[in-house]
C-alpha cells in the first residue's frame, strides 16, 4: 500500500517505490500531461513532475506555498495548463484565473477548463492587466512564470490591480529571458531589487532560491506586499 504524507494544504508526498510529489485529482480518472495516477484508500492522487513545473520545484525547494482549498489565484503564463491543473487540484473550492498569450496553448487550457470548473482561461498579455481587469476578482496569490524581459514590472502591475492586501506573490524568474549575456545571479539580484524598490506596490521578499536541479537559470521568489 502506498504511503501518503501531507506537505501542506492540498500538496502531498506519495511513497510508492519512491517519493513522488502529488495533488488530489479533482478530475478522477483523467490525466493532463501523462502523469501517473495513484489510488490510496479511495483517494486518487496525481503525481506532480517538478521538472515540468516551476511551482512543483518550489515545493521541493521548501518554499511555503500559501494556498488553501478556497484560495483565488491569478496565474500568469499558464501555457497549456500543466501546473495550472495542479493548482486547480489544490484550490478545489477556489478559482484559478489562467492568463496565457499563445492561442495554441489557450485551446488546451479551454479543454482543461471544460472538465475543471475552477479554471478560468484568459487569452491576454500578462503585461497588460487592464485588458483583463473585468475578468479577475481580487486574489490571494499571484503565480507568475512568463518568458518576458520585464518580469518584475509585470508582477507589480498585476499586484496593484488584483492582489489582496494580505496576498502573496510567487514568481519564477527566468534569467535568460531578461539578459542572455549577464550571469544569472546578477540578473536575479537586479530583479529582486526591483521588486523591493523600483515599483509600486513594493514587495517584502520572504524567500528566494535557485530552482536547480529542476530548472536551470531560474530563481523562485516568494514575496508579500510591504
Curated annotation (Swiss-Prot):
One of its GO terms (biological process) is tRNA processing. PROSITE patterns: FIBRILLARIN. Its EC number is 2.1.1.-. Pfam families: Fibrillarin. Keywords: Methyltransferase, RNA-binding, rRNA processing, Transferase, tRNA processing. S-adenosyl-L-methionine binds at residues 82-83, 100-101, 125-126, 145-148. Involved in pre-rRNA and tRNA processing. Utilizes the methyl donor S-adenosyl-L-methionine to catalyze the site-specific 2'-hydroxyl methylation of ribose moieties in rRNA and tRNA. Site specificity is provided by a guide RNA that base pairs with the substrate. Methylation occurs at a characteristic distance from the sequence involved in base pairing with the guide RNA. Belongs to the methyltransferase superfamily. Fibrillarin family. This is Fibrillarin-like rRNA/tRNA 2'-O-methyltransferase. It comes from Methanosarcina barkeri (strain Fusaro / DSM 804). The gene is flpA.
Amino acid at each position: 500500500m502506498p504511503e501518503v504524507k501531507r506537505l501542506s494544504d492540498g500538496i502531498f508526498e506519495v511513497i510508492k517505490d519512491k517519493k513522488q510529489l502529488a495533488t488530489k485529482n479533482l478530475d478522477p480518472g483523467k490525466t493532463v500531461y501523462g502523469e501517473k495516477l495513484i489510488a490510496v484508500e479511495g483517494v486518487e492522487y496525481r503525481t506532480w513532475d517538478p521538472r515540468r513545473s516551476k511551482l512543483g520545484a518550489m515545493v521541493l525547494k521548501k518554499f511555503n506555498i500559501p494556498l488553501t482549498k478556497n484560495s483565488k489565484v491569478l496565474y500568469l503564463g499558464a501555457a497549456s495548463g500543466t501546473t495550472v491543473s495542479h493548482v486547480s487540484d489544490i484550490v478545489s473550492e477556489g478559482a484559478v484565473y489562467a492568463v496565457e498569450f499563445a492561442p495554441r496553448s489557450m485551446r488546451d487550457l479551454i479543454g482543461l477548463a471544460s472538465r475543471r470548473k475552477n479554471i478560468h482561461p484568459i487569452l491576454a498579455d500578462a503585461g497588460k492587466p487592464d485588458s483583463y481587469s473585468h475578468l479577475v476578482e481580487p486574489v490571494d496569490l499571484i503565480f507568475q512564470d512568463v518568458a518576458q524581459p520585464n518580469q518584475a514590472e509585470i508582477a507589480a502591475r498585476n499586484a496593484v490591480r488584483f492582489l489582496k492586501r494580505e496576498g502573496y506573490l510567487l514568481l519564477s524568474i527566468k534569467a535568460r529571458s531578461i539578459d542572455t549575456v549577464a550571469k544569472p545571479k546578477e540578473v536575479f539580484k537586479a530583479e529582486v531589487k526591483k521588486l523591493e524598490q523600483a515599483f509600486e506596490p513594493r514587495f517584502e521578499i520572504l524567500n528566494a532560491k535557485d530552482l536547480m536541479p529542476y530548472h536551470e537559470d531560474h530563481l523562485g521568489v516568494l514575496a508579500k506586499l510591504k
